[in-house]
C-alpha cells in the first residue's frame, strides 16, 4: 500500500513538473521570439525606408544620383555580409534545412554561432535590398535559440521541443498566426506529433502572438475580411490553376538550387560572387524597384489588382531570378517571402488571363491561392500554408479556395522536385529526412561503437594444428588469418580446417575474400551487409590499409538497432 501511494505521488509530481516546464518554456520562447521577430521586421522596414527615402533626403542627392542608391546599398550590404562571414567563421549559411535536420536527431545541437550569424546576414541582405525573405532566418533563429536553451538547461526538455517552441514562436509573431505556428512547427520541422511536445509549442505560439500584439500592435500583412469571394467561380479556378502554381514553385526551387550549385562548383571567391549578385540585383532594381527587398508593399499592390499585365509578368520573372541569384551567390536570406511574392504575381497573372480568355473573374482570390500554393510547395507544409492564409486574411472562403490550389500544387511539386526546397537541400548533403529519425540515427551511428575484439586471430606462419587448438580453446567456430601487421588475409572456419589435410597451407584453404564491413560504416550500412550473411561474426576492416579493426555479430547489430528504435519511438510518441 505504501509503495502504491509513493507511485501515485511520484506520478503526480512528474505530471506537475512537466506542466510547469511546458508553461515556462512556452511563455519564455513566446516572449523572446515576439521581440526578435518584430525587431527583425521593424529593422528591415527601417532600413528599407532609409534606403528608399531618407538617404536621398538627408544627403540632398539629385535625382540621377538617388536613382543609383539601390546599387550602392547592395554593395554596402555585400561588404557587411562578408564581414559577418569572417567574424562568425561561417563557411556556409544556415537555415531551416539545418533546423529540420537538428529536430530529427536525438543528440544534435545546432551551431549557435553560425545560426545567429546567418540571421544577422539575412537582416543585412533584406535591409540592403536583396531579393530575399525574412521568415526562414527567423525560423532558424528560433530553432537555434531552442538548441541553445536546451544546452543551458541540461536537457530537462528534449531538443525537439525547444526547437519546436522557437519555430512556432517565430511564425506566430511574424504572421500574427498562432495556429499556423503550431501547425508549421509540427508539419514542416518536427514532422511528428506527441502529447509531450504539443503543450509547450502551443503556449509558445499563442504567447508569441499575444506579446507581439501587446508590445508592437496588430499589423496584419493582409486584410480581406470585408471581401466575400464567389466560391462558385473561385473554386473551379483554384483547382484548375493549382498545377500551374505547382510548376511555378518547381521552377523557383530549381533556379535557387542551380544557382547554389553553380556558386559551389565555380572557383570564384565568395567576395566576387556576392558583389556580382549585388551588381546585377542593384542594376535591375534601379529600373524595377518592386523586386528589391522583402516586397511587402508591391505584394499588397498585386493583391489589390495593381500593375499592368506585362509589368506583372516582368516582376514575376525578375523576382524569381533575382532571388535565385541572391541566395545562390551569398546575399543570404529566406525563400518564403519571395515565394509568397512569386505565387501572388503568378496567381494575379493567370487570373487576368482566365478573365480575358474564358471569362472567369476570380479577383484577388486567385492571387491569394497562388501565393499560398507556391509558398506551401516550397516549404513542404500545405496545411500550415492554408492556416497562414486563413489567419492573415481572416477569410474562411479564401482559405477554402487556397486549399484546393495548395494541395494540387503540392502534388505537382512533390512529383517533379521533392517534398520541399529544404528536403532537397538536405538530400544534396546526403541526408534523407523522409526516411525518418530511425534511418538518420542508424546512418549516423558508427559500427565501431559495437566492434568487439572477441575473435580468434591466426598468424600467417601458424599451422593447421595451432589454428584448431586456438578455436577449441576459445570455443569459436571461425578464425581470421592475419599478417604480422594485422592485415586481414582470409577467414577460416572449423569445418574447413577439419576437412583438409594437416599439411596444407592455411592461406590456400582460407576464404580470401570474406564478407566484411568497412571501419567507417554506419549501423544502417552494417545491417545491410549483414542481411546477406550466415556465420558467427563479420570482420570490420580499414579498407585503405586492410588492417582488421575487430568483429561484429548479428546479435550486437540488432540489439543496437532495437535500442535506437526504442529511443526514437519514445521521442515521437511520448
Regions found by a protein language model. Name each.
Residues 418, 536-537, 548:
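Short beta-strands and strand-coil junctions in structured, solvent-facing domains, enriched
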Residues 508-509, 520:
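Conserved SET/PR domain catalytic loop and adjacent active-site segment
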Residues 429, 569-574:
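Post-kinase regulatory C-tail/linker adjacent to protein kinase catalytic domains
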Residues 491-494, 498, 503-506, 523:
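Nucleotide-binding motor/catalytic cores of P-loop/tubulin-like NTPases across gene-expression machines
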Residues 183, 387, 489-497, 549-558:
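Short hydrophobic beta-strand motif reused across regulatory alpha/beta modules
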Residues 1-444, 449, 453-454, 458-489, ...:
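Alpha-helical transmembrane segments and immediately membrane-proximal extracytoplasmic
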Residues 458-476, 482, 499-501, 516-543, ...:
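The conserved cystathionine-beta-synthase
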